[in-house]
Amino acid sequence: MGASGRLLRAVIMGAPGSGKGTGSSRITKHFELKHLSSGDLLRQNMLQGTEIAVLAKSFIDQGKLIPDDDMTRLALHELKNLTQCSWLLDGFPRTLPQAEALDRVYQIDTVINLNVPFEVIKLRLTARWIHPASGRVYNIEFNPPKTVGIDDLTGEPLIQREDDKPETVIKRLKAYEAQTEPVLQYYQKKGVLETFSGTETNKIRPHVYSFLQMKVPETIQKASVTP
């Protein structure tokens, strides 16, 4: 457990559409943690044209997963720059070999699992439509266009991204479940897994904050409670 003067090593997990990305950003800002997102890390390396990014891109272009060894090397290399910081990992580890490799180098204090029912996520993601030219995003449930399928400003048709089509969403969720279930079981056995269940991210977040309040070293919290 995090104690005063100790650095926090945390991981956040959740399916695509669970609110993990937004949640991570808010948590890291509130508690002044370093946020290491595997997606951001890959994009940053691709911009720099690093050797590992070129390798990773070749797998992504073929629709394959980046091998565990390469993903682990990338994440651990970045974590070397954060030895004096408390951090939250987002998108890594994604597989059991990655979790085991991380464990050999760092002791993970807590793993936050955002458990949102797949049916809710499916509705959330498939309700999203975009106007390609401007990037404007509509949500049929919360922010619908004035006319179904039409952009409010230009009158041009809206499209649904391939990733947001129902059949793709179901496939992504099943792939996530198959890949991460062993990771969740691994952390459960270690006694560091904390699962937060619900259908609305805004209602889950306060419980995550309360839990982290007990975990985050006091030295970090002082800054976040100072007006």
Curated annotation (Swiss-Prot):
Annotated GO MF terms: adenylate kinase activity; ATP binding; GTP binding; identical protein binding; nucleoside triphosphate adenylate kinase activity
Keywords: Acetylation, GTP-binding, Kinase, Mitochondrion, Nucleotide-binding, Phosphoprotein, Transferase
Pfam families the UniProt entry points to: ADK, ADK_lid
SUPFAM superfamilies membership: Microbial and mitochondrial ADK, insert 'zinc finger' domain (SSF57774), P-loop containing nucleoside triphosphate hydrolases (SSF52540)
Domain of life the protein comes from: Eukaryota
Chain intervals for the UniProt region annotation (NMP): 37-66
Protein's cellular compartments: Mitochondrion matrix
Region named LID: 127-164
Disulphide bridges: none
Chief place where the protein resides: mitochondrion
Catalytic activity entry: a ribonucleoside 5'-triphosphate + AMP = a ribonucleoside 5'-diphosphate + ADP; GTP + AMP = GDP + ADP; ITP + AMP = IDP + ADP
Residues that bear Phosphoserine: S37
Positions annotated to bind AMP: S38, R43, K64, G91, R94, Q98
Gene3D superfamilies assigned: P-loop containing nucleotide triphosphate hydrolases (3.40.50.300)
Class of this enzyme: transferase
One GO CC term, this protein: mitochondrion
Family indicated by similarity: Belongs to the adenylate kinase family. AK3 subfamily.
Xref: HAMAP family: Adenylate_kinase_Adk (MF_00235), Adenylate_kinase_AK3 (MF_03169)
Domains as described in the record: Consists of three domains, a large central CORE domain and two small peripheral domains, NMPbind and LID, which undergo movements during catalysis. The LID domain closes over the site of phosphoryl transfer upon GTP binding. Assembling and dissambling the active center during each catalytic cycle provides an effective means to prevent GTP hydrolysis.
Binding partners and assembly: Monomer.
Name of this protein: GTP:AMP phosphotransferase AK3, mitochondrial
Organism: Rattus norvegicus
